[in-house]
Amino acid sequence: MDTTRGLYLSAAGLAIAVLLTAAPGRLPAQQTAAVAIDGDDIGGAVRSPSGPEAGVWVIAETAELPTKYAKMVVTDEQGRYVIPDLPTANYSVWVRGYGLVDSPKVRAKPGQQLDLTAVPAPDARAAAHYYPAIYWYTMMKIPPAKDFGGTSDIPKNITLETWRHRMNNTDCIGCHQLGQESTRTIPAQLGQFKTGAEAWGRRIGSGQTGEFMMNRLAVQLGGVPFKYFGDWTDRVARGELPRHKPPRPQGIERNVVVTSWEWGTEKTFVHDLISSDRRYPTVNAYGPLYGSPEYSSDDMPILDPKTHTATSFRMPVADPNAPESFGPPFHATAAMKPMQPSPYWGEEKIWSQRANNHNGMFDRKGRVWFAAAVRGIENPAFCRKGSDHPSAKVFPLDRSGRQVSMLDPRTMKYSFIDTCFGTHHPQFGYDADDTVWLSGSGPVAGWVNTKVWDETGDAVRAQGWAPFVLDTSGNGKVDEWTEPGQPAQPGKDTRLAGSGPYAVMPHPTDGSVWYTFNVFVGPPGFLRFDPKSKLSEFYAIPKDGIGVRGGDIDKNGVLWGSGSNGTLISFDRRKCKGPLSGPTATGTHCPEGFAYHKYPGPGFEGFENTSAEASYYTWVDHHNTVGLGENVPISTANLQDGFVALKDGQMILLRVPYPMGFFAKGLDGRIDDPSAGWKGRGLWGTNGDRTPWLMEGGKGAKPRAVHIQVRPSPLAK
């Protein structure tokens, strides 16, 4: 908004609105009072034959900027809207909402009063087309309890809880938005099949992840998911519709402003983005966003939201002979070549990379640190047995699939920090050494002392690692331990194993580091690591919680995680009543520390009191970067096209209504201008679905970076 231009409510402006009334999609201006706008806003009212349409979206999109750009707002109780602060361009504007079909697109410019006609859906099927994926996904059936335990084709080791875990936030749902139109239907290009189960058996063998997907469903789950996925899509094809209808945005949800930009390419995905230092959220104010394309490309997307320009940076590796990071032992979920032809890309190899950049994090100096490969998988000698490195003496490491790199945006210098431990998510601690802690480190906690790195450039000296050891001896120090799977022995500690640390969460005040632990293999839960004693504490998710994926820690030390039971799981160590170390403190000793906060959205049949929301990651807004207040946990709402925040005990859905299929794997907050109110802050995320061609727009659609802001009212400009 340019406040120097004043309110654009002149008679001339109103006259323009009147002249436009003959065009499809517009209402006569006299039917509603003009809303207050500036010269860089578009505003008006939305009505249908039933009257004002409250809680629907008005979307403005343009292709006249360097990259495709869209802005979306929600109407107030009188159907009024204001789309603020639009760059100069011609826009297509239309209405989208539950109970409606998209209105005809109308051409408009900033500074224009524009009343719009909403189009009621002619039938239930047309209305359901716009429902979030969760409403369609929950039409799929879950096997009955009697089919588990070896009584059916479901492998005996798979329990009902395991099945729900894998349907809710791992397996297919961890990479794709199941329930969107492209997944609830079978593409014609795939071929003709006798049954839906047969079609799914062919479908998941497609592309460079076909082998991985086939192994998960056909081998580990005995091929039974094909039956349930096939039955689901068969019923959809016959015209069956969701049992539930979504509510329109209410209250604070109507104050949300969403801005999106295309970036990346139509063949690659952007796993995550970073905008600032979560400890100091004014770092990189108004600056570029840096994306992580993981194993789809070495071309890191960069978005400048001020100039609306999307570029890329080619991420190198230190070893010019390093192989591509595909297939075991590099990356088990993708292969060099498609297993079977893709219905979209045929036999083309669309992904190619060596850096495998998974996630980035800003430091307070404005540099970006990445969990990225710098070499092949075999570790150098200083990591291995016989090395004099202090960490290697305790626990030598032979391999790491991904290490650490750093980009200084001021010079575009790219540095390699060769770590012995693997990496996945980086997060800076609150210590004087600006230690960056990494997850994805397998059996150890891994860290890089960035102060030492800055002073010496010596990656060997700057890094350290330690195994996860429970103090089951109870003496407050690391002793001889029993190995994973061995029976406990009096006087010995216990080493933990499994899939290891996933999310990493340095405590803001006490120096400890927390992780979500064993997301994929082993008992899932939260793990606390003490950098001073090198001891760990483990708190297993109770059975009714099923599991956890991404998580974060709030300013009070409470843990928050995306639960596999359709809830936001919290854990407060301060509520534990029993001892936190000793022979009984092995994971199940503090159920009283856990609480569950149900996500919005329906559950599967038979689990109606739950939500099927497949949240991938949770982040806590320490600094009110979004506009909902400090210390607010926010989860990705992967089946509802956006994010969901827990504020004052209420779930607030922050939906990205266009293009449908928004599926984030992380989120970040930034304050661009602390004195600019809601306009100077916002939440950042990107569409992280591995297959952008499955979202609205189809083949050719690119990932979108989004900026979500919460203004004081739906008409704030």
Residue map of PLM features:
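Short, acidic Ser/Thr/Gly-rich low-complexity loop/linker segments typical of extracellular
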Residues: A36, A63-P84, V106
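Short, ordered, surface-exposed loop/turn motifs in non-cytosolic proteins
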Residues: D40-I42, S48-E64, T88, Y137-G149
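Surface loop/turn motifs at the tips and blade-to-blade linkers of beta-strand repeat domains
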Residues: V270-L273, F313-A318, E348-Q353, D398, ...
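Short, conserved, GDST-rich strand-edge loop motifs in beta-rich repeat architectures
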Residues: E181-Q189, N284, G291-Y295, P301, ...
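The canonical Cys-X-X-Cys-His
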Residues: N169-Q180
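Structural signature of eukaryotic scaffold interfaces centered on beta-propeller domains
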Residues: G264-A285, E347-K365, H425-D433, D493-D510, ...
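A short, solvent-exposed loop/turn motif at the edges and junctions
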Residues: T62-K68, N90-K109
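Short Pro-Gly-centered beta-turn/loop motif in secreted/extracellular proteins
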Residues: G51-A54, V82-N90, Y98, R107
